[in-house]
Amino acid sequence: MLTFARQQQRRNVRWLLSLSLLVLLATLLSLCAGEQWIAPGDWLSARGELFVWQIRLPRTLAVLLVGAALALSGAVMQALFENPLAEPGLLGVSNGAGVGLIAAVLLGQGQLPGWALGLCAIAGALIITLILLRFARRHLSTSRLLLAGVALGIICSALMTWAIYFSTSFDLRQLMYWMMGGFGGVDWQQSWLMIALIPVLIWICCQSQPLNMLALGETSARQLGLPLWFWRNLLVVATGWMVGVSVAMAGAIGFIGLVIPHILRLCGLTDHRVLLPGCALAGAIALLLADVVARLALASAELPIGVVTATLGAPVFIWLLLKSAR
């Protein structure tokens, strides 16, 4: 038994080291790739100062943090709702952020600065989170709370569609493109959003013990002494914050929170002590590679990153559905 535990521990360490190396390689690729390939040796040149340090570096950092946040949100939700198909958009938080953003554009008549739009997106996400907490205080089961999140997401999606469809504002049409996900507008002015993600990411990565208990089911978690109501509310708020900040920075990006945790579990990383940092690293890798594809796929334009992740994630999602039905 001791030998098996040591082998498992070494295997987990190898996984995390490998993922860390891949994050480094994907980061280097993201900084080099673009309309002009800039090798690391040219990063200190005048061209590198502009393209690498002022344009690509803030974008790369944002992609890293958003990828980690979405994957961690998926891992938390899958443990919280005991459903391997749960993902961040399922609770309606992403759509709530979109409603907040569109409301800001309508009320501000397109005159609000970017930081104000970001705050409105976060506020929209947190409002949906507070509504979910209201449901949670009624001691609903996780399945009913999940259905409440789906219903809220549908309502928010309908509100966004109505607002965009009847609007003649160019800004709202641009927001429709933005809601497909993209990092094209990210620069150092959004650094406050990146900073807002970091403490929550670190805190979530340290919550392996309650998540391991929650993954066993509500009954087992109660028997082990976990204050279920407290932790469920706290984790819903943390998930809402991560998703809200991510949507404010990059729009709605799907499938990262669904696919990454499930793939890592299939690879044997079931303990949340390893799964959580693994999800953060793997989510960052996946979104970095998707962002590179979005930048390079077309010569004259940039693909929405949500299109890239959906194209790659939809077949995996169908496979997961078929696998869970067996």
Curated annotation (Swiss-Prot):
Q: Mind telling me which Pfam families this protein's record contains?
A: FecCD
**What membrane topology does this protein have?**
Multi-pass membrane protein
General function of this protein: Part of the ABC transporter complex BtuCDF involved in vitamin B12 import. Involved in the translocation of the substrate across the membrane.
Per the record, its GO cellular-component terms are: plasma membrane
Q: Name one GO biological process term.
A: cobalamin transport
How does this polypeptide assemble, per the annotation?
Answer: The complex is composed of two ATP-binding proteins (BtuD), two transmembrane proteins (BtuC) and a solute-binding protein (BtuF).
Indicate the principal place this protein occupies in or around the cell: membrane
**Disulfide bond sites:** none
The entry's protein name is: Vitamin B12 import system permease protein BtuC
The UniProt entry's sequence similarity note says:
Belongs to the binding-protein-dependent transport system permease family. FecCD subfamily.
Q: Supply the alphabetized keyword list.
A: Cell inner membrane, Cell membrane, Membrane, Transmembrane, Transmembrane helix, Transport
The domain of life for this entry's organism is Bacteria
Cellular localisation: Cell inner membrane
Q: Name one GO molecular function term.
A: transmembrane transporter activity
Which residues span the membrane? 17-39, 59-81, 88-107, 111-133, 146-168, 188-205, 242-264, 274-296, 303-322
